[in-house]
Amino acid sequence: LNWELNSPEDFEKLQKDFAAVVLCVGGRKAKGLPGIQVDNKQIYHAKDFLTEVTKDMLNGTELANLKDKDVVIIGGGDTGVDCAAIALAQGARTVHQLEMQECDATANSARDNLCNIVIGDYTISYGTMMKRLLRDEEGKLKAVEVAQVEWRSERSGALPDAMEVLGSEKLLRAQVLILALGFSGPEDEIFEACGVKRSPAGMLADGGE
């Protein structure tokens, strides 16, 4: 417990101390967006934001305060909803959660009549993509440009692609952006420390020793 595997030497020690080592790793590498740099001041990965808030609550220290701020959350899953709930609880001025998929195409669409429940909910926008960030003269985040998308196939039998709806662009005020996009796999350090082979997609590959 309370021990990190950071180097090949750490792994060699485990192998000497135990008859077998079972590598059980989850996907902790948070997905990002091209060209967007997370700084944990104005732009967060959801897991980092939620971790910071939880530590503040447990330690009795000041919360990552979103009071009177405009918050945009990219990602319409449960983690994004958790971030939205915290933002509202902390007194954010506005909260907008964006999801590229249409509601009826999401994993939770069949649960508790979700899509009918969220009709008219101004805090979450389905079929919506983020186009770019806008910053003020000091380089601070001030707004996010978004647009609606339609999912359609260009040819018969092809999977649908997200097509931007021309003329649907609008600006959302934002001093805080939270990326709740899921995970792309385990963090690189665990592979490097253990010498385990990876697949081209970055997952565990057969033949690792």
List each model region and its residues.
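Beta1/beta-strand and adjacent pyrophosphate-binding region of the FAD-binding site
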Residues: 67-77
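N-terminal Rossmann-fold NAD(P) dinucleotide-binding loop
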Residues: 80-81
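Short amphipathic alpha-helical segments
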Residues: 33-37, 84-86, 189-193
